[in-house]
Amino acid sequence: MESLEQIKSRVEATVPGAKVEIVQNGSPSQQHSLLLDNEHAVAIARFLRVDPALCLDFCSNVTGIDWLDRTVKKSTKVKKLVDGQEKEIVETTEEKIPGYLEAVYHLYSITLKQGPVVIRMRTGDRAEGAPLPSLTPVWRSAEFQEREIFDLYGIRFDGHPDLRRILMWDEFEDHPMRKDYVQPDDFEWEPTPHDEVLARAKQHYTPRPQLDGAEKITATD
């Protein structure tokens, strides 16, 4: 199978205006990925599916990632005058990187028996309803998984045929897979009508009679 560098070059040469970045994965798996620019993501996805050398016709998994705002420290060596002498010292600066959300897709070719190729898209920020293009029109297996990411992370997939919650109820607020999500104090109080159900149950079932001391059954040899 082609390397990611080769795939990147062919995508940018074939899809007008497309920009692809290779994202390195430093974990033991070293499963590097391709970051697609959102404007051309659907066109790139169609190319990956129909290109004869790739034929990535199956999307096995789609997941969301929440990246919080973070501060990165950078160290650089500079020359400065210290006590009248020029010396090389290390200066540390801080760079604030705003948070964002990602959707990551794992692609395989069932026809050519090869893969995976991992692609990802990135929102501009972590705002409620941050948009990304839906890839469900290219891989139908992404439909429910994009709905799950919408439900749990809050990414709005433009072009999705049926974008609505899939695990949480419609009235649920917030997105429980976000890293800054705060769990409510009581899961049973709302929206489960616990008190109403308990009252109906007491009306339906007659209470069990209490046994006095003479009616208790005791074990015998």
Predicted regions located by residue number:
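Terminal low-complexity/charged segments
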Residues: 1-221
